[in-house]
């Protein structure tokens, strides 16, 4: 059994179950209540799984085979569906540059989006995509090794991770402080923030007026 789900993109239109708006009827999915998963007919990159991120958290109207209907918030059944796991090893080569070996495992929406960009995008700049997947934001980095595992759109295993392995080198993340240091002990500053990327502070001392919206 399945149910027809009609909703809208939450980034453009919030579905209001109490006020009819034809713009609410923009996205069509099929919901499988027994397994709590969705089929998205108009997105090639999706298979049977969680609802796409652009409708999560929005309201929708669910219609069953008897034409009975109900309104409900679209939720993610598996709270650990979308993750990014990183393993990073840093080696300082003669204290002149850092060699960064990294393995990244993307699951859920992260994996789906990366596969779609790699396989379906007509405007993809391969160099920009490679930069994005190999610690973007580091000035003057050199990519020594770069490989992707499980990159095809079709994956025989549910929520198979999209894995990126890379080795890069960069001088910009290692700063020599010995020029101004009069002590005999040599000191260096390693810019860890550039390696792990920009972090967002989601907490606040004041009560939020609107909920956090993450894209």
What is the predicted function of each stretch?
Residues 2-215:
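A sensor for short, sequence-defined functional sites
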């Amino acid at each position: 059994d399945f149910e027809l789900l009609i909703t809208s993109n939450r980034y453009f239109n919030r579905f209001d179950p109490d006020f009819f708006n034809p713009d609410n009827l923009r996205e069509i999915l099929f919901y499988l209540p027994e397994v709590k998963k969705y089929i998205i007919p108009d997105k090639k990159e999706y298979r049977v799984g969680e609802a796409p991120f652009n409708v999560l958290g929005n309201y929708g109207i669910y219609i069953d085979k008897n034409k009975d209907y109900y309104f409900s918030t679209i939720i993610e059944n598996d709270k650990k569906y979308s993750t990014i796991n990183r393993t990073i090893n840093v080696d300082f080569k003669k204290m002149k540059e850092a060699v960064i070996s990294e393995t990244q495992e993307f699951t859920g929406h992260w994996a789906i989006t990366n596969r779609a960009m790699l396989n379906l995008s007509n405007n993809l700049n391969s160099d920009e995509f490679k930069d994005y997947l190999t610690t973007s934001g580091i000035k003057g980095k050199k990519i020594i090794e770069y490989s992707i595992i499980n990159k095809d759109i079709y994956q025989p295993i549910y929520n198979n991770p999209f894995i990126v392995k890379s080795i890069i080198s960069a001088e910009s993340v290692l700063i020599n402080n010995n020029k101004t240091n009069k002590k005999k002990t040599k000191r260096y500053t390693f810019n860890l923030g550039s390696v792990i990327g920009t972090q967002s502070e989601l907490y606040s001392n004041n009560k939020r007026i609107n909920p956090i919206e993450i894209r």
